[in-house]
Amino acid sequence: MIYSIIICAGALLGLWILEKLLAPKDTRPPLPPGPWRKPIIGNLSDFPPKGTPEWLFWAKHQERYGPMSSLEVMGQTIIMINDAQLGIEIMHKKSALSQMIPDAPFAHMAGWGMSLATERNRQAWKTIRANMKQEIGTRRAISTFHPKMEIGIRRFLLRTLDNPDDLRFHIRKEANAFMMDVAYGYTIAPHGKDELYDLTQQSVRQFSHIFSPGEWSVNFFPILRYVPSWFPGASFQIKAAEYKRTIERMTMVPYLWIKDQVARGCSRPSILLRLLQKGHYESGSHQEQVLVWTNAEFVMGGSDTTVSAVSSFFVAMALYPEVQRKAREELDRVVGPTTLATFEHRLQLPFIDALVKEVFRWHPASPLGAPHITQEDQIWDGYLLPKGALLLPNIWTFTHDPSVYHDPMVFKPERFLEGKDSPPETDPMKFVFGFGRRICPGRFVTDEKLFLIACHAVSCFFISPKDPGAPEPDWLPGVISQPGAFDLNVVPRSPAHEELIRSIETDHPWKNADATDISRFMARNQMI
């Protein structure tokens, strides 16, 4: 057996050498520099080890190779872009030349084939994007949801006041509660178990795993999708089946629940209901899948980036008390010490606005941006970006470039304010949410929610590390990155501020939750 393997390997190596010797000389410009390609597998062994923050690993390419570098895996060229201006030129200004979505076999196996990250049916992709743009793609559209945001954020303050040690849980719950209310008209359980909320959280965690770069061998060797699950090394088949069951339930349960409500005459306003009433959707049709995935994208896309940004904000406030003090001083001066700011105050709060930008710059929610595929050969700075190459922007290097941002590792909102002798530094909103037609459609949700949470949290709480000597936390690897464990003290500024936080209980008492109804619906339809 071993001799057969050696003979096969030798034959493949011989064919590879023969191909290189006999191939006609390529007169095109060279690819961007990069690590040496090994025969057959190329740079497969040059990907970051598991558990390594991918953006830091690839940032080393900028040090070694400059603003662009290249790799190759099984014939697939990968171009790492480590310079913000280059990224804007290639993927935004020339977005029509690189708007294709990379193939992701594992994501399709795991049931995510209709996601905006993978959907290659151009019409379906355009429909989902258009629906999202209409509902949440502009600040004007988002403004219709401001009252819901304000109530949800005040409830977040109350949860944090009552149980500050569970801050991360409260951040996640608030983010998902808002998106599920907007998308489905669904009210989550304020306390206790909620099947639909749990299902959404499970899907978000699986999303990060599914799309983690270099995680799945089947993405490099698509033929492996046909290997049975019992075959050695094919455990990805079992994972794919598990993830597929989760996402099918997460997308279909709220859709069927709303259809059931319509039939019973008790439906509530929601994005899904509005879209459902616009047309007829046959059960199991492609149009129905486009509809349910539109709303799945609303919920997951608008919540995970918000959780990351808000978590980073709280860490920054604990690590940089002087920034927290300046933000509080501005709020007390402009809004009042015991009054909560509203969205209408934003233009009067330049330091808070700069603070929001600095959160996005300091640690982008998605440190590696969404990949693009080139649709034709392109030449940049004397290097070839061949047709079909995968473009991968390292957003973290964009936001930590010392030639663009002074002291990039330091959290400093003042960098975005007009100075006597210096103009504001580059607004990170130009690239932290992606480029061109693949820009994050939920970016305004995250931006506006972070603004109001920052205002309310700084107005009402003192935020500090439990251990004053604790180092800055590590940020966890993944498509959406969040800070690692970092214990905080979050305490009310005064009894008056505690009373202000608790006023939500009388201003907007908890509504009846839908958790019991959805659990009964799922049990009745055997969806648990």
Curated annotation (Swiss-Prot):
InterPro entries: Cyt_P450, Cyt_P450_CS, Cyt_P450_E_grp-I, Cyt_P450_sf, Cytochrome_P450_fung. Transmembrane segments: none annotated. One of its GO terms (molecular function) is iron ion binding. Heme binds at C440. Keywords: Heme, Iron, Metal-binding, Monooxygenase, Oxidoreductase. It catalyses: 8-O-methylsterigmatocystin + 2 reduced [NADPH--hemoprotein reductase] + 2 O2 = aflatoxin B1 + methanol + 2 oxidized [NADPH--hemoprotein reductase] + CO2 + H2O + 2 H(+); 8-O-methyldihydrosterigmatocystin + 2 reduced [NADPH--hemoprotein reductase] + 2 O2 = aflatoxin B2 + methanol + 2 oxidized [NADPH--hemoprotein reductase] + CO2 + H2O + 2 H(+). Its cofactor is heme. It comes from the Eukaryota. Pathway: Mycotoxin biosynthesis; aflatoxin biosynthesis. It is an enzyme of class 1 (oxidoreductase). Its EC number is 1.14.14.117. PANTHER family: P450, PUTATIVE (EUROFUNG)-RELATED, P450, PUTATIVE (EUROFUNG)-RELATED-RELATED. Belongs to the cytochrome P450 family. Converts O-methylsterigmatocystin (OMST) to aflatoxin B1 and converts dihydro-O-methylsterigmatocystin (DHOMST) to aflatoxin B2 in the aflatoxin biosynthesis pathway. This is O-methylsterigmatocystin oxidoreductase. It comes from Aspergillus flavus (strain ATCC MYA-384 / AF70). The gene is ordA.
